[in-house]
Amino acid sequence: MQKTLEIILSALKEQGQPLDANALDRIIRARNRELRGPVRAVAKKKLLPFYQQVKENDPALWRSWNIDDALESLLVRTLRMKPMRTASGVATVTVLTKPWPCASACLYCPNDIRMPKSYLTDEPACQRAERNWFDPYLQVALRLRTLADMGHTTDKVELIVLGGTWTDYPRKYRFWFMRELFRALNEAADAKAQHASITERRAFYERCNIRNERDDLAAFSRDEQTRVTCGELTYNQAVRDLYGANEGWRQASACQTATLSDVSREHARNVQAAHRSVGLVIETRPDCITPGALTEMRALGATKVQIGIQSLDQQILDANLRRISLDRIARAFELARLFGFKIHAHFMANLYGATPKRDVEGYRALVTDGRFLPDEVKMYPCALVDGTGLVAHWRDGSWKPYTEGELIDVLVANMQVTPPYVRVSRMIRDISSHDIMTGNKKVNLRQMVDEELARRGAAVAEIRTREIGTRGTDLSDLALAEFPYETTVSSERFLQWVTPDGKIAGFLRLSLPKADAIAAARTEAENERGLIGERGRKAMPPESEDASHQAERDIAPTSADAQSELAAQDAFPLSAGEAMIREVHVYGAVAALGHASTGAQHTGLGRKLVARACDIAREAGYERINVISAVGTREYYASLGFEQHGLYQQKKL
């Protein structure tokens, strides 16, 4: 390994630029031929971890290579695995909450009792979570290590918290989960401290006799899973039996508690940490979005909500047992927008009762009706998974998957109507083909859609298609464009830096709330607080009362302290006359904080976007402007004149 690395370093010194994939492959293949081993002794994925190990543990050898910052940058860019993982400008870390009863029972939703509702064991993020006992600290710490070994910079991290419905979990568990996410980020710069924490946490779960090996977990859940798949048990009943009544899980759950003050302390550390949270995403259902729930999410540091919409056709929603009205979905969008959250909607084609025509009409409504208008969309086809209620409809012929042509036509039509301020993040779920009984199993579905769009000569305006990615950026080529649009509660301005060919190097989402919408939301928040106060659950939204929660609720009860921690907050944290910056994002390969980048970041583009947003808000008559800053971006916005103001940072105009 050492000789291979030295050959690469020599080539980099000679070329003065990163090696392309072919040149690197030739070096690796030549070394493997020299070694003549039974297996490949040298592989790209092993080289960067080896280099980092030498740098940390063998300083004499590392110094002998005469590596300066410029050469190290070339080496990392040459050996980085999957460079697109951080091309959007941020290193993403996805974590899952533990299996837990769900207050809903949708027809198509998977019932894998080893996972939180709707997720499947073989999905990559799920595998990582299960190996780490669904522990947030372990998931973050080990994922950061993996990304670093792959050559990715991890000082700016977006945390994505998945697991069905966030507010279905006990509040003290939610606080603990967030505290541990931030603690993992805060300790990541101290390898010894983090190693000690990882070792201690693993030992704790082992003392609780909770297994994390694949075969053991399969055996642990086999009988109950069979009964769930056959319809003898519900998902909630099985989760109660497996986890709520299990002594090991009860012991672990008893320790999975924290207060909001605990979270706030980790937030304070993260403001100037080496690994900062620049975004925090929480997944929930639209019927769980209330002023109180959003206030708590904001207090925990969240900046984006993922909402499972699935359809905007009431008949289809009812047929799939969604148990929600379009008016309730619309109100979820309105409230999330007023609170400043980015809105990431899940939209599913080919549900029971759907047709290609109805799917296209529903998606068009999602991106054109002012009651909705998400910022980001996961747009994927319904997958038939064993053990779901949809299986019976497939067997009796009342549901069948779209043909490949029908599905591509739907997705192509949807892409063509997607506005320039919307990012289509996904077109498939990470579901293994062996879990899909019928329907689309092609992992390159998006590529197929892109190829069909190109064949038709169709114009596509959505963000992901236009992202500048890892390519270099000539600032003189960029122009600032503005795209205005209206929602039922605000006037929105999407500001974007674009190249002459329409590529996007950065953008800002500015919301100009309507005064009557702010007043209505304040009244709703005060009414919600009053109702909760009457039930002795001051200042927060009600927990789900599903009976199957009770076994584990007894493990981690919601104390009076946890109920009242947010009581000091205003019922509604916003006022009329305040504009809101909901997102600022600059693309390009992630640059380490304080280091140079060849991409679009750290070029003043973000500052100019914020300055223009302030001008627009001032001209529109707003007196102040808020920003829904992540914990790790507070310092940046402070440098632009924003001050901490309750749950947001604010600047007078």
Name each model-derived stretch.
Residues L185-N186, A252-C255, C288, G292-R298, ...:
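C-terminal scaffold of the Radical SAM
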Residues M1-Q139, R143-A258, P420:
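Flexible, acidic/Gly-rich N-terminal and inter-domain linker regions that tether
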Residues A519-A571:
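Intrinsically disordered, low-complexity terminal tails and inter-domain linkers enriched
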Residues D122-Q139, L159, G163-R183, Q194-H344, ...:
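Conserved non-cysteine loop/helix-boundary elements of the Radical SAM core domain that shape
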Residues I616-S629:
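Conserved GNAT acetyl-CoA-binding A-motif
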Residues S629-Y648:
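Conserved active-site alpha-helix within GNAT-family acetyltransferase domains
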Residues S597-I616:
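Conserved acetyl-CoA-binding loop-helix of GNAT-fold acetyltransferases
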